[in-house]
Amino acid sequence: VKRALVCAASCLLAVLVLVQPGSAAEPRLVGGVAADQPHAFTAALQTTQGEFFCGGSLVNPSWVVTAAHCVEGRAATSFTVRVGSNDRTQGGELVTPDRLVTHPDYTDTGTGGDIALVHFPAPVQAAPVPLGTATAVGTPVRLLGWGQTCPTPGCGTSPNVLQQLDTQLVDATKCTAPINASVELCTDNPGGNAGACYGDSGGPEVSQVDGHWVLLGVTSRPGNNSSTCATAPSIYTSAVAYAGWINQQLAPPPPPTPTPTPTPTP
C-alpha cells in the first residue's frame, strides 16, 4: 500500500506537518526554515475541530489543488481550508468547501492520479498561483508546508508558521519506490536528510519564473517507501502534467440548452 505523507492519528495528537522535515531549534520542514515571504496561495486543510492534516495550493479564487489521498473518504463539508496566511491558525480566510473532485486515475495502491480539487462556494481574496509549464531535471524548486519537522511518525508538532525548503527536481530513477515518471516528479532530499514529512501531503512544490512563483507539483509520498521522512528523494504529482485536467474542472459549466418554445397551433 502506498504510504502517503498525510497526517495520521498519531501525527494529529502531536500536531502535523508537510514534506520530509529536519531538526532545528525552530519547527520547520525537515531541514527547512520559516517562509521568508508571504505565500497567500498556500492552503491549510484542517478538520472542523481544527486539526491540521494536509496542505494545498490555491489555483483559482474558487479552487484549491491538493493530493487525492488527502480528501479520500472525506465529505467536502467535513473540513475547512485556510488561505491567504502563512500562519495556519489565524489570518487570511477560512472556508468550508462545497465540492471535491478527485482524479479518476487515483488508487491508494498505484502510481499517478494522486491529485484532487477542492471547490469553494464563493471566490476568496487571496491571489492564486499559476500552473507551471516545464519540469526539467535540475529545475530549482521550493517546498512549502506546515508538516512535521522531525522525521519519524508522530515525533513532533506541526509549526503554526509556514515552512520552506529549497531543493531541485532529480531524475525519476533517484526515487526507488514505484513512480510514474510521465505524471510524477522525483525531488531531491538535500544533504540526504531534508524534505517533506507527515502533514505536508497535498502542499505546493513551486518554482520561480521571471520572478513569479508557479506551481509544478503536489506533495504525494516518499520516494523509498520508508516510514522515516527525508531519507531519500520524494515523489510529487506533476501539476504540469495534469494541467489539462485541472483547467477542465476549473472551466465554468456550459449554459443549459434552452428548451424550444412550441409553435402555437393555428
Question: Model-predicted segments: where are they?
Answer:
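Protease-domain processing segments flanking chymotrypsin-fold serine proteases, especially trypsin-like
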Residues: V1-V65, G73-R74, S78-S85, P159-N160, ...
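C-terminal subregion of chymotrypsin/trypsin-like serine protease catalytic domains
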Residues: R3, L58-V71, T80, Q164, ...
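Subtilisin-like serine protease catalytic core
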Residues: A76, A136-G138, G156-T157, Q208-G217
